[in-house]
Regions:
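Multi-pass alpha-helical membrane architecture of UbiA-family
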Residues: 1-154
Length: 154
């Protein structure tokens, strides 16, 4: 089985389409699709980090997780995924005319997230669980950024 984190990301985040359809929202589908892409990169990144705790088991089970696939280049790929996630989130906000305040908030969250990845997590499996848990804070921060961006188009 190759890249279970990618399969998880594709299926887990499908809920943004379901929520969009259920609410009959005025948000264009193209904006929701941009959000979906950001969520795929987000899930792929945090679940790759979480999978570092299980590398030995994944090898024994012949489960080709993203952490094994990326190998020694894992941190580079994680940085790329996290930066890509935030780029898509900024594109999402731009597609809805959220403005400067939203961009500043998202850039601030992205810098904190990258510091967390590169200075706190540091590619150590024993730090993976706490990094994984901190994604809740990134999520709530992004939610507030979206709420602020949608109400203050400055």
């Amino acid at each position: 089985f190759i890249l279970p984190q990618f399969i998880l990301a594709l299926t887990y985040n499908w809920g943004c389409f379901i929520g969009w359809a259920a609410l009959g929202s005025n948000i264009p589908f193209s904006s929701i699709f941009i959000l979906y892409l950001s969520l795929i990169f987000w899930t792929l990144a945090y679940d790759t980090i979480d999978a570092t705790q299980d590398e030995k088991e994944d090898k024994n089970l012949n489960l080709y997780s993203s952490t094994l696939l990326f190998g020694s280049k894992k941190v580079i790929f994680l940085n790329i995924m996290i930066i890509t996630k935030y780029c898509f989130i900024i594109f999402y906000g731009s597609s809805l005319d959220f403005g400067f305040i939203f961009n500043i908030l998202v850039l601030t969250i992205s810098i904190i997230n990258l510091i967390d990845l590169n200075i706190i997590w540091k590619n150590k499996p024993e730090n993976a669980s706490s990094y994984f848990s901190r994604n809740n804070y990134y999520g709530i921060s992004l939610l507030f950024s979206i709420i602020i961006g949608s109400h203050f188009n400055v």
